[in-house]
Amino acid sequence: MDKKQSRLRRGRQTRAKIAELKVNRLAVHRTNLHIYASIIGPDATVLASASTLEAEVRQELAGQSGKGGNVAAAALVGKRVAEKALKAGIAEVAFDRSGFRYHGRVKAVAEAAREAGLKF
């Protein structure tokens, strides 16, 4: 079993437990260059999302080095997804790190979302 398959296996276990609880989840996906965060409902509908590909996020990151593959960009994405979720009336979610370690950019998304008012 290689590294990617192990990550996907861990992600499946997390998603199965969250599906059993029937709560909204904050799903995070990370690539080398970008980070994506989505609030997904129990019926698998996307209720709010944010990523480093959004024009507003890219404008805020324009003065910094890198395009979005850093902790500062991840924190900005976490803050934006929390703001969108609160605007949609979602205050509480389960954190789905998709098998990624809770470290670096994934941790930055979670902490920024908590600071912006989202409860895990």
Curated annotation (Swiss-Prot):
Gene Ontology terms describing biological process: translation
CDD domains given in the database record: Ribosomal_L18_L5e (cd00432)
InterPro entries listed in its UniProt record: Ribosomal_uL18_bac-type, Ribosomal_uL18_bac/euk
Alphabetic keyword roster: Ribonucleoprotein, Ribosomal protein, RNA-binding, rRNA-binding
A GO MF term: 5S rRNA binding
Keyword Ribonucleoprotein: yes
Cellular-component GO terms for this entry: cytosolic large ribosomal subunit
Coiled coil: none
Keyword rRNA-binding: yes
Source taxon at top rank: Bacteria
Disulphide bridges: none
SUPFAM superfamilies linked: Translational machinery components
Family matches, as PANTHER family: 39S RIBOSOMAL PROTEIN L18, MITOCHONDRIAL, LARGE RIBOSOMAL SUBUNIT PROTEIN UL18M
Functional summary from the UniProt entry: This is one of the proteins that bind and probably mediate the attachment of the 5S RNA into the large ribosomal subunit, where it forms part of the central protuberance.
HAMAP family hit by this protein: Ribosomal_uL18_B
Family: Belongs to the universal ribosomal protein uL18 family.
Subunit record text: Part of the 50S ribosomal subunit; part of the 5S rRNA/L5/L18/L25 subcomplex. Contacts the 5S and 23S rRNAs.
Protein name listed in UniProt: Large ribosomal subunit protein uL18
